[in-house]
Amino acid sequence: MTNREEIERRRTFAIISHPDAGKTTLTEKLLLYGGAINQAGSVKGKQSAKHAVSDWMDIEKQRGISVTSSVLQFNYAGKCVNILDTPGHQDFSEDTYRTLMAADSAVMVIDAAKGVEAQTIKLFKVCTLRHIPIFTFINKMDREARDPFELMENIEEILGIKTYPMNWPIGCGKEFKGVFDRNTRKVLAFSSDGRANGVKKVDETEAELGDPALDELLTPYLHQQLVDEIELLDGAAEEFDLDKVLRGELSPVFFGSALTNFGVEPFLENFLRLTPTPLARVDSLTGETVDPCRDEFSAFIFKIQANMNKAHRDRIAFMRICSGKFERGMEAFHVQEGKNIKLATGTQLMAQDRAIVDEAYAGDIIGLFDPGIFSIGDTLCTGKKKVEFAGIPTFSPEHFARIEQKDTMKRKQFVKGMEQIAQEGAIQILSLI
């Protein structure tokens, strides 16, 4: 496979939401359908027997929340998928903001009972600043939910973006039977025996709208309600425009339940069909765009994470490749340091787990061992013509605190520890001179 073919099969996106909308659970189910895991976990708090793959830190397992962004990669239907699972809680939003700089599109998860919430609005605004496509997954349809038409109106009024329902829910709560795919014009009815607490793939039955068999499968009432609602949608909604989606002006909307897997695979298939290949980035030195398929390698560092492996007390720099190909042991020019460095080892990331990679392509996110030479926003490149990507912006702190060491004899270690956490971007240090 040529470099261009490898690059064009990459899909790199972030998943954003307000806390507890089901973002990490959806991530797990995408991994399940992608074959990266055999049994999905979910975020349910301390009592959950199986924790989410992307929530690898002890505090995440204990509290049942995501506190740091995770990178996960799998292959599905010929596409190489890179998922950036981000924290939803505003306490950790700085990490989320930076991670969005590495994404080519975003999936916005919304709770069907609550609609658009505060943190969703903040993260949506960051996405719009980058003009990246935003796809919407309305989650928790297996619970009591607001009317689907009302949810669409809620998104458009609060976020100011047009919506287009790619599928339509059949019932909600205990009566959530499946979805109608507006592209194929097929009804996908989910089998209740496929639930198995959502840890396995769900079974689907496909049928034509209006098929008498749907009366038995859905109940006559839900079948007729679906026919009426689809007729209303087809008459009222504007035509689907992929160009508007790619410009971030129109959000395709999908309905489903991540917990029970209902609607997850149809979403994944349609999302990968519509979401863009790696986007061109702007060289801040010239103002020109850098073609992802060009031969010369370029990349930037968007995150630094220490102690992912407790046994080695390591420090990993997360690198988004913007063009060309990474090869193990290659040399690249470190723009901020003004010198060539050897990229001895790259690692493929699956949350906390890692594997050595010999090569990676534009769109991929890999980890580099960092002995202290990298900072967030650094650019790496090869070729005679140097490029530099814009630095990653800092955002206003969410909380303020005064920190003092208890043991004055350990001030050196205290200062070093604070500096390391600041270098990771987890905190901003304001000191009196």
Q: What kind of feature is each model-predicted range?
A:
Residues 1-433:
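Structural and coupling elements of P-loop NTPases
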